[in-house]
Amino acid sequence: MKIVLATNNKDKVKEIKAFYDGYEIYALNEICEPFEIDETGSSFKENALIKATAVYAKLCALKLENEFIALSDDSGISVEALGFAPGIYSARYSGKDATDASNRKKLTCELHKLRLKKSGAFYTACIAVASKFGNFSTHGFMYGTVIDEERGDNGFGYDFMFMPDGFDGTIGQLDVKTKLAISHRSKGLELAKYILNSLEKYYK
């Protein structure tokens, strides 16, 4: 059984490959021409399933459904002081042409509008799997505090502003091994292993 990820995000691909080192994993652009997927869902789960099923439909069109499954991740940060924004809009928080840097800048500005330097926050990740045997999903969470400054140089997204509970530094200041052990995505991927292990025997 081979896995195609519903993303071309190099950081996500690298992180998922590191976690699932026993599986044969491909980025979307390694299997087919990249295509836009409209994330029209109202939750992380809905968006993750939209992405996974769209990629699986492409696999079926290429007659690869007996060889591959599709796996997607939809994740984001929810900040208590901001009414749990940006949530599902984390990747495009600062607008249509958002970048990680512009999103972090907007988050800092929103905190400062409230005269805050920090707030309770949590990350959510939904992992969705689409296969010829159906669609499945899991969730992972990481709780902590978001701060109004960036620290560290390891990670992406909002990692440099997020201090997980039990740690004195941000995710951006942690080594890769520690991040993989505690992250929301890793927790969701760990639960998804049960799905992958169950499916794998039918693809041999």
UniProtKB/Swiss-Prot annotation:
Annotated GO CC locations: cytosol
Catalytic activity: XTP + H2O = XMP + diphosphate + H(+); dITP + H2O = dIMP + diphosphate + H(+); ITP + H2O = IMP + diphosphate + H(+)
The protein's name: dITP/XTP pyrophosphatase
Binding-site positions, substrate: T7, N8, N9, K10, D11, K12, S75, F156, G157, Y158, D159, K179, H184, R185
Pfam families the UniProt entry points to: Ham1p_like
Gene Ontology biological process terms in this record: nucleotide metabolic process; purine nucleoside triphosphate catabolic process
Entry's cofactor comment: Binds 1 Mg(2+) ion per subunit.
Domain of life: Bacteria
UniProt subunit comment: Homodimer.
Enzyme Commission number: 3.6.1.66
MF annotations from Gene Ontology: dITP diphosphatase activity; ITP diphosphatase activity; metal ion binding; nucleotide binding; ribonucleoside triphosphate phosphatase activity; XTP diphosphatase activity
Chain residues that bind Mg(2+): D38, D74
Family that this chain belongs to: Belongs to the HAM1 NTPase family.
List of catalytic residues: D74
Origin organism lineage: Bacteria, Pseudomonadati, Campylobacterota, Epsilonproteobacteria, Campylobacterales
Cofactors, names only: Mg(2+)
Keywords: Hydrolase, Magnesium, Metal-binding, Nucleotide metabolism, Nucleotide-binding
Role: Pyrophosphatase that catalyzes the hydrolysis of nucleoside triphosphates to their monophosphate derivatives, with a high preference for the non-canonical purine nucleotides XTP (xanthosine triphosphate), dITP (deoxyinosine triphosphate) and ITP. Seems to function as a house-cleaning enzyme that removes non-canonical purine nucleotides from the nucleotide pool, thus preventing their incorporation into DNA/RNA and avoiding chromosomal lesions.
